[in-house]
Amino acid sequence: MEQDDRLLNAMFEMCNHKNPLNDGQREWHIADIPGLLREERYDELDERYNQALTESFTSREAEKRYFFAWNQMDNPFYDMDTLVEAGPQGLALIKNWQRARPRSTHAWLAEAQYWNHRAWLYRSYGWARETTRAMWICAAACNERMVIAALNAIDCEPRQWMAAALTSTNSKVFGQPGWLVEFLVGADVAGQPLMEDLAEYHRHSPQEVDALMAHSGLSFADAVCPNLPRPSVLPECNDDAGQKYWLAVCLAIFPTAFYVLDEYIPFCMPRWRGSHEEIREFLESSVCDHLSAAEREHLELLIWWDDHRDLRIKEVDSPAEQERIIAKAEEISLRAHIQESRHNALKWLRVCYSDLDDNDALWRTLQRSIVEKVKFNNYFFDDTIKFALRDFPDTLWMYNFLCQNAQQTEFAVPKIRRGYFQYAGLLGFEKDEAQGLAWLDSVADIQYNHNWRAAIKNFNWFGLPEHFVPLAELGAQRNIPAALNLLGLEHNNKENNGLLPYDPAIALGYFQRAAEILHRQLALRESTPYKLIDNGGYTDYENDLQNIHFSIGVCNQRLSKQEPDTEKRSAYEKELLDNLWLAHQ
C-alpha cells in the first residue's frame, strides 16, 4: 500500500508540477577533455581531475562520479567518448598532454582508457561472434599499450586507482601481455619486442592490418617495450598478472572501493568462464569486509541478474515457476537497497509483462521505472506515451516524462520527440524552434534512420496523425531516408485517406532522394574495406532500397498511365521495369 501511495503521489506530481527545462548535460561529467586539450589547458585538466580523484576516496557519490567519468562499460556518456571516437586525432591530443605534463596521472590514465576502449571496439561488444582473427590481434595490441600507460598512471601522484580497475577488466577479456609477469617479478623488459602477433599477421595480410591499425593509431613505431616504472604500490606477482592481480592493485590504492567491485563481479560470471560459486566465495572473503549490507546485497543480486537478464518468461513452461520468478523480480524492484539492482529488476519486468501482453502490469512497471529514473529504450518510450495519452491527457505529465528521458540517453526516439514537441511548442513545452532543432540535429544521421521511421509512424498509433507530416518534413530536411520515404508513401496513396494530396510526381521525387542517399551510403560502406563491427544503429540499407525501388516503379507506372506524350510514357515504362528489377536484387 505504501508503494502504491508513493506511485500515485509521484504521478500526481508529474501531472501538476512542471520541472525546470533541462539541456542534456551529462550526469557524471567532470571536464570537456577534448575541448581543453585542443586549447592546451593542461593545468586546468589536471586540477579538475586531481580534485575529483581526491574526492573519490571520501564518499560513494564522489567515487561514482569519478568512476563513471572514466569507465565506458554500459556507459556511453563518459568524459573520454568523443576523444576515443576521434581515433588517432584523439590519441595525438593525449600525447601532447603527456609531453607537456609527463608526470600527470590523468594524462596517462587518458591513454590507458583510450587503448582500453579501442580494444573493445576491435573486439566488438556482445558475444563477438563476427570478430576476425586480425581484430582480436589488434585488440591484444591495444591491451598491451594500455598496460604500459596504466603502469605510468599508477606511478604518478596523486595515486591513481582507476587505471588498475580498467586493467583488471581488460586482462579478463584480452589476456595479459607475455612480458608482464616477467616484469612484475623483477626482470628488465625494456627493448623487448611488442605487437609480435600483429607483425606476423601483417606479413601475411598487410592491407587488412594497415586498415585496421589506422582506426586506432596503432603503430609499429611503438613495437619495442620502453623503460617502465615500478610503482611501489604494486603487490607481489605469483605468475598471474590477470584480473585478480589488478583488482589487488586497485584495492591497495583504494581499500574501500565499491564501484570497481561492481564491474569486477560481472566478469567473473559463467559467460566469462567464471562461476556463481566463485563469486559467492569472493563476497565472503576478507576483500569485501568493508562493504555495507546494501552494497553486499547489490553484488549478490548481480548473480540473479546474470541468470535472468536473457530469460524470456515464455521460455518457462511451468505457470507456478513463472509466478515465482516474477514475484522475485517484483520483490527486488521494490526492496533492493541500491538503485541499479532495482533498475535491473524493472527492466526485466517490463519485458516480461510486454511478452505476456499484461498491459496493466506493464503500465504500472513503466510508471515505477519513471519514479526510479530508469532510461527507456525506444520501444518502451513509445509504449509509455501511448498509455499516458490515455490516462494523463492535458497535464504536464508528458512534458516531464520527455525531459527526463531525453536527458543523457543513448536512444534516439526520446530525443526526436523532445526536439519536435519543443520546436512545435506542444505538450507543455514553450515553443523554441532553435532548441527543438538542436535536439533533432543531434540525431540527424543515417544511423538513426529506423528511429526516425518509428518516431514518425507511431504518431498514427498514438492517435495524433496531425504530427506525422510535420515531423516527417523535419526529417526530410535532414536527409533522413525514412522520412523521405514516408512522405512519398503519403503522396502516393490513391485511397483518399492519405495525410497528403495524391500526387505520384511529388512522391517520385521523395523516393528518388531517399534512394540516392541509401545508394551513396552503400557505396561508402563498400569502399571502406576492413571496417570495425557495428554494434548497433541502422543497417537495413538493402531491404529499404528494395522497397523504395518498388515504390519508384509504382510511381512510374501511374505516371505512364496519365501521360499523353508517347515518348515520355515510354520513359516512364522503362523506369518502371528498371526499378522493379532493382527491387528484386
Short names for language-model regions:
Residues 31, 35-101, 113-253, 261-292, ...:
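Short coil/linker segments at helix-helix boundaries
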Residues 94, 143, 150, 247, ...:
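Hydrophobic/aromatic packing residues within the alpha-helices of TPR/SEL1-like helical repeat arrays
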Residues 97, 153, 249-250, 286, ...:
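Canonical positions in the second alpha-helix
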Residues 107, 162-163, 260, 296, ...:
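TPR alpha-solenoid repeat register
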Residues 1-45:
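Compositionally biased, long intrinsically disordered regions
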Residues 109, 116, 165, 262, ...:
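TPR/TPR-like alpha-solenoid signature
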Residues 103-104, 159, 256-257, 341, ...:
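Short helix-capping/linker turns of helical repeat alpha-solenoids
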